[in-house]
Every structure is written in C-alpha cells, then in structure tokens.
C-alpha cells in the first residue's frame, strides 16, 4: 500500500488529500492537523537559501529580452529587472499571505524573516551578471514584504522581534532604511 502512495503524481496526491478531507470527522481533522504540522515546519535558513537560489538563477539575457520596444511601449532594462525580480519573489510573498490567512502569525513572521534574509544575501553575495542590473531592487522588494506584513496587523511584540532580527541577525545595512521609512515598527 505504501508503494501506491509513493507512485502518485503531485496532482493525484492532492486529489487523495482533498477526498479524505471531504469525508469529514476524524479523517478531516487528521488531514488538517497534518497540514498544519507541515506548514509549521519552517526552516528560516532553508527559505533564505531558496530565495537566494531563485534570484541568483535569473539570467541577465532574460532582462535584455524583455527590455526594448513593444506594442505596449518601451520597457527599460531597469523596469525589466524589477519585473523579473518581482516574478521570482511572488510565490514567496503569496505564501506569507497564506500563513496570515490561516492565522499562523508566528509562522508568517518566521517565513518573512527567511525571505528577507534570502533577498539580503542575494544583494550582498550574488556574483550573477543580472545582479548588476538589479541595483536597489532587492531592498525595495524586502521593504514591500515588510510593509505587507506590518499592514496585516502585527502586534508590538512581533514587530519588535522583526526589528531585532533585521538589526542583529539579518541585514544591519538595511535596518536604517527600513526603520527610517517607518518599517516595520
């Protein structure tokens, strides 16, 4: 029986989980509990590594391909770079929002910290050619995530913990910018 489960495609596995959760009762409760366990297993450094990897994988040629004239007007290389970075970060920003929607405030904060750390590492460690075209984009994106997080109504303890994380562990070079701009305190 375990072999059957391991052979399911991701779509088939999702279908099984959905059918089980529709059964209700103890089965649904078990599925929901396990889903929360999976979502609670956040590794801040793993998230940071994933963010760094997706940003560091952007090819400068993709930026050049997007830049230039089109039916919709002209796109500068800088605008194309912003679009590319935002596209890569969108799934991470969306996941942070899902944590909020589920009422998982601690997980949301930890996840945001991992994303911010990954963005910071990208700005300071990446050797990619694209990074040269992405000047100021990382700090702006991290600031946008912090603003979104803050606007979702964080308490003062969470805000203080986020500020401490940014100042002491993550990105001391960015702290002045974030806190001068009113983020996230």
Residue ranges and their predicted role:
Residues 2-3, 22, 26-185:
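Eukaryote-biased, non-catalytic alpha-solenoid scaffold regions
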Residues 1-19, 32:
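Eukaryotic low-complexity, mixed-charge intrinsically disordered interaction/regulatory segments enriched
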